[in-house]
């Protein structure tokens, strides 16, 4: 299981922007391949995504520099090493980069290599990836957070909240959960059409109509759920990704579609009112990533009622998560492998969360590829929840389809309503 060669190439993501794909070729001829996603609303403390900044190619978004780093320094450093020791490989990658945010080699170059090594190991062992990724956690099939109505930075519309998600917690298993979500998605399209609303989709495959308010979005989802024959609050519950850092300006949170602005306390009250009106069980990035005093208030007021997920807040970084845990900030973390840049550091963040009673939600990015690594990692880590977009666009459904394959192989329990237990 030793590395013969590592080579990378520039490919396109789901937004038509360049990203990097790496092949780890073993001495046996086995090839492990992985590609890296890219975010639109990003946390300021994410690991550095290295771009070329050459205006003559891809409007500056090329990744040839990152590709060269893989083909040269990274290839030379890892040649001859075993893929059996993931932590050692990732440690060498971090030492080779030698920056706090992986800005020398690029987190995209490092991550593509890290994930490709893990995939090469699974292929060498002739085992499914989710099996070789498991480190003793109880594996479950995750509840999907299906982003079927998009706003914010993920859509070209006037909706403030970035993601309105449905969670089929009442399903008996993952295939039925996927079926439920898909049926609601198609009914929602007809509901929008009937009201003369746009049925074009955003980056993550959800519909992106211009509507009057965030409450109207939840009302539209409620109507679609009921018309599809499901019970709101029993079969299906809601989750929100506010991406509040995108709404924060000069000390206030601006809900432009509703012509309102809030300070932290007022926005917390706004959420409390929504929670009392709709079966919302999870709010992600409810406040700005730097508004830690506000986050403390939010956690104190609503942390015993809903899951409060830190995305931009924690950026899958164990060091930052540790600070949040110490201060009682949030009660869950979003896991995005490209925010931190290696598989090992991602695992560290997951373990730290579990050890301190925080939940984990596995997540894609808005600029995705056909790579399904996160589906296997969600199952392997037993996190119980996954965000991978809506029920259309192959970059999203690829992850759902991989989860169907895993479910068929493993007959694992579906997390379902267990995610609500505190």
From Swiss-Prot:
One of its GO terms (cellular component) is phosphopyruvate hydratase complex. Coiled coil: none annotated. Transmembrane segments: none annotated. Binds a second Mg(2+) ion via substrate during catalysis. Belongs to the enolase family. Catalyzes the reversible conversion of 2-phosphoglycerate (2-PG) into phosphoenolpyruvate (PEP). It is essential for the degradation of carbohydrates via glycolysis. This is Enolase. It comes from Legionella pneumophila (strain Paris).
